[in-house]
Amino acid sequence: MKAFLVALVVAIELTLVFAGCPTIVSKNRWGGQQASQVQYTVKPLKYVIIHHTSTPTCTNEDDCSRRLVNIQDYHMNRLDFDDIGYNFMIGGDGQIYEGAGWHKEGAHARGWNSKSLGIGFIGDFQTNLPSSKQLDAGKKFLECAVEKGEIEDTYKLIGARTVRPTDSPGTLLFREIQTWRGFTRNP
């Protein structure tokens, strides 16, 4: 009985600690393929790199799932990546979608993949901001990643354009993330 009560208390504490964590739509649920090869990372990661997918946005799980299947197909079959390049993606519906996932190296920023978590906002944010649902989900996801010990408490948040020649994460999203916790121009 004592062991049961201890287990129950631990379960309740974990629920309270991670209560703010958004649900993550698994790769299996959105119809993604498994990676052809995996390189693992060591947590906690020091950097978070924000991207946009340069695609139309999506507003519900079915639409986002179709978009992700297409992105993964492009990454794996055209760019010869082992998986979709991002660790996680955030849809216009405000849901977090699993990409390469936790503890796995993405293919989103050459030279930075082993030490960063790559988050792709689904859409093109050169002239439009992501939805408020996307932005809120992004902030909550980062808080959750810190709470879970996946990224350092003093993580550095950067836009993809800071570490490689690209417009990503788009002009307006880049401007937005400059107001977020951990943002730096000089990683």
Swiss-Prot record:
Disulfide bonds: C21-C144, C58-C64
The keyword Signal is annotated on this UniProt entry: yes
GO cellular component: extracellular region
Signal peptide (residue range): 1-19
Pfam families per the UniProt record, alphabetical: Amidase_2
Record has Ribosomal protein as a keyword: no
Keywords from the UniProt entry: Disulfide bond, Immunity, Innate immunity, Secreted, Signal
Domain N-acetylmuramoyl-L-alanine amidase: 43-170
Entry's Gene Ontology molecular function annotations: N-acetylmuramoyl-L-alanine amidase activity; peptidoglycan binding; zinc ion binding
Biological-process GO terms, alphabetical: innate immune response; peptidoglycan catabolic process
Tissue spec: Localizes to plasma (at protein level).
InterPro entries attached to this UniProt entry: Amidase/PGRP_sf (IPR036505), Amidase_domain (IPR002502), Peptidoglycan_recognition (IPR017331), PGRP (IPR015510), PGRP_domain_met/bac (IPR006619)
Compartment(s) of residence: Secreted
Superkingdom field: Eukaryota
Main localization, broad class: secreted
Function: Peptidoglycan-recognition protein probably involved in innate immunity by binding to peptidoglycans (PGN) of bacteria and activating the prophenoloxidase (proPO) cascade immune response. Binds to 1,3-beta-D-glucan and PGN.
Recorded family membership: Belongs to the N-acetylmuramoyl-L-alanine amidase 2 family.
PANTHER family according to UniProt: PEPTIDOGLYCAN RECOGNITION PROTEIN, PEPTIDOGLYCAN-RECOGNITION PROTEIN SA
Protein name: Peptidoglycan-recognition protein 2
Species, as recorded: Holotrichia diomphalia
